[in-house]
Structures are given as C-alpha cells and as structure tokens.
Curated annotation (Swiss-Prot):
Keywords: Acyltransferase, Endoplasmic reticulum, Lipid biosynthesis, Lipid metabolism, Membrane, Phospholipid biosynthesis, Phospholipid metabolism, Transferase, Transmembrane, Transmembrane helix. This is 1-acyl-sn-glycerol-3-phosphate acyltransferase delta. It comes from Homo sapiens (Human). Its EC number is 2.3.1.51. It is found in: Endoplasmic reticulum membrane. SUPFAM superfamilies: Glycerol-3-phosphate (1)-acyltransferase (SSF69593). One of its GO terms (biological process) is phospholipid biosynthetic process.
C-alpha cells in the first residue's frame, strides 16, 4: 500500500469526513427548515434553494466516490443519445445489486449537472435518517411504504407535485424493490415460475406497479427512460466502507435511452414491457460477465470539480472553529472536558457507521424475502 492509500485508510481521516458531513449536514438541514417559510409565498423559489442545499449534502458523498476513492465510471451508450443526457428530465431505471449503486446513480446525475434536483423512489423509513433523509424530505422525494394499498394514492400525489418542478432532474428508481441477494433471488424466481415469467439470472423480478404509476404521472414531463445496467470490473463487489477507505473501483454502466412515448400507457402493457426490459438487462449482464464489456460506444463523462469545491468550503467552515475548540480544551487540562469530547466523537463515529450500515447488503431489508413469499402464497 502506498502512502496515500495508507493515509486514506486511517480512522482519523474517517473521523474528519464524519465530522464535516454531520456538522455541515445539520447546518444545512436547519437552513432547510427555515426555508419552509417561503413555501406559501414562492414555492418555486423554495424548490430552487433546496435543490442547491441538497447538492451541498449529496455532493459530499459523490466527492468521496470520485475524488477520495478515485473511482472511475465508463458509460456505454449511443453517442446520439449521449448528447441529450443532462438536458432533459428522465426516469433512470437502475439494477440493485451493489452497496454503492445508489451512489453511482448520484455520480451519473452529477456528471450531467443534475445531482441537486435528482429524485428517488425510496422506502419511507429513510425519511427519518438524519441529514440525508431530512434533506430528501425538503426536496420532495417520493417515499413509499411498499404496500400497494397504501402507496397507490400517496405515491401518485407525490409524483404529481413534480410535474411543475423548476429544475431538470433524473428520477432514480430500483424496480426490483430491494437489493439483490441469493436468498431473495431464489424466492423471486419461485414467483416468476408461478406466474409463468422467464427466469432472470442476475436480477430480481421487477415490481411493475411503482414503475407504471411513475411513467403515468410524469408523462409529458419526462422525456425518456434511461435503462441503466451497472457492473464493476474484475468481479469487484464495492462497499461504501471501501470508498471511505479510499479504495478505487471501476464502474461500467450501460445506458439505453428509451423515449417515453415508446412505453405503453395501459398498465398491463406497461407491466409486460418492464418484464421484457429486465429480460434484456439480464442478457446484457450475462454478456458482461462473459466478455467484460457492454455494447455501444464507451464514453467517460468528465468529472466536475464542484463536489470537491463544495467539500473544501464546508470543511474550512466547520473544521476551523472545531480545532480552535479542541486546542482550548487541551489547554484547559480538564479530564472531564476531554472525556466528554472523546465521547461525542465516538457517538458521531457510531452514527455514521450506522448510516453506512443502511447500505450494507447483509443488513438490507427483508422486503424481498417476505413480500415475495406472500405473493407466492396468494
């Protein structure tokens, strides 16, 4: 391991990142709280401000991926479609197999200048996660309980609110509903057999209702669906903790632009269309494992400096008073004060590790297990 790699793996560096993220995140969340005063006066101004405040938080994680870890991303796509990326609203359909696939989705959004306005369809429990979850609340993310009877109305209402959103955005959605594991895959394929659907090797059975309602609600606002199939070279299985340790990965992302008018309006036909899409995604993954590459032309969208600039700004803002406080405590010589300081740091570290744990595959939700079993029994 070289000197830079050794430095990046040090716990002290991780604590600095944790402190900057938590301190700046809570400051930004507080500012977002006060922006609620704007909502009844000027809703669009509220949205534009929160779009930029959101960028201040999410770009810190993208900075870790792109600058600290140095992870590279090659996009395989049609050059004609590439020219439209970042210039239109789009629904981005991502496979859900890796712990950092959400971060790669954010990186894609950042490369095309849409990170601040990017939306997700996320489980409602994430709305209570400090900093990121609260940020999502203020930027009108679409939350679901993953119980269709409850979500039918609430998700449609949330999506309708995005029809007049003033910023360009990618709406990121994992149609599989939960992250891929072998156990979930086995149960999902039992459901596929029971429904007479083709077997998928590298994906779970897509959940069509959420996708159909998203397309229906955003039609004539969103221009296209971007079908994105993600994989990593050398059979690597990247983790957020690995990114924090500065480990470099190389992502390959196959992106197909599908005009929204090509997607059926009827829900049943839309469902059949999505199942066919996932059969094609599965074939692309199989081809990648066989050849190590995706179809179409490889392109590397340039890494933008703004994520790094944003982090340096917040780091300088919150670290200077912190070090002043630290020096004053050391000079005081009070054992109680120092013990309190260490305790606060320990709690902060545990808190960030807990947020990282939300992304870990082996600690993921049991949704894909229990819900698929229920469908199998129906």
């Amino acid at each position: 391991m070289d000197l830079a790699g050794l430095l990046k793996s040090q716990f002290l560096c991780h604590l600095v990142f944790c402190y900057v993220f938590i301190a700046s995140g809570l400051i930004i969340n507080t500012i977002q709280l006060f922006t609620l005063l704007l909502w009844p006066i000027n809703k669009q101004l509220f949205r534009k401000i929160n779009c930029r405040l959101s960028y201040c938080i999410s770009s810190q994680l993208v900075m870790l991926l792109e600058w600290w870890s140095g992870t590279e991303c090659t996009i395989f796509t049609d050059p004609r479609a590439y020219l439209k990326y970042g210039k239109e609203n789009a629904i981005v359909v991502l496979n859900h197999k890796f712990e950092i696939d959400f971060l790669c989705g954010w990186s894609l959004s950042e490369r095309f200048g849409l990170l601040g306005g990017s939306k997700v369809l996320a489980k409602k429990e994430l709305a209570y996660v400090p900093i990121i979850g609260w940020m999502w609340y203020f930027t009108e993310m679409v939350f679901c309980s993953r119980k269709w009877e409850q979500d039918r109305k609430t998700v449609a209402t949330s999506l309708q609110h995005l029809r007049d959103y003033p910023e360009k955005y990618f709406f990121l959605i994992h149609c599989e509903g939960t992250r891929f594991t072998e156990k979930k895959h086995e149960i999902s394929m039992q459901v596929a057999r029971a429904k007479g659907l083709p077997r998928l090797k590298h994906h779970l059975l897509p959940r069509t209702k959420g996708f159909a309602i998203t397309v229906r609600s955003l039609r004539n606002v969103v221009s296209a669906v971007y079908d994105c199939t993600l994989n990593f070279r050398n059979n690597e299985n990247p983790t957020l903790l690995g990114v924090l340790n500065g480990k470099k990965y190389h992502a390959d992302l196959y992106v197909r632009r599908i005009p929204l008018e090509d997607i059926p309006e009827d829900d049943d036909e839309c469902s059949a269309w999505l199942h066919k899409l996932y059969q094609e995604k599965d074939a692309f993954q199989e081809e990648y494992y066989r050849t190590g590459t995706f179809p179409e032309t490889p392109m590397v969208p340039p890494r933008r400096p703004w994520t790094l600039v944003n982090w340096l700004f917040w780091a300088s803002l919150v670290l200077y008073p912190f070090f002043q406080f630290l020096v004053s405590m050391i000079r005081s010589g009070s054992s109680l004060t120092l013990a309190s300081f260490i305790l606060v740091f320990f709690v902060a570290s545990v808190g960030v590790r807990w947020m990282i744990g939300v992304t870990e595959i082996d600690k993921g939700s049991a949704y894909g297990n229990s819900d698929s079993k229920q469908k199998l029994n129906d």
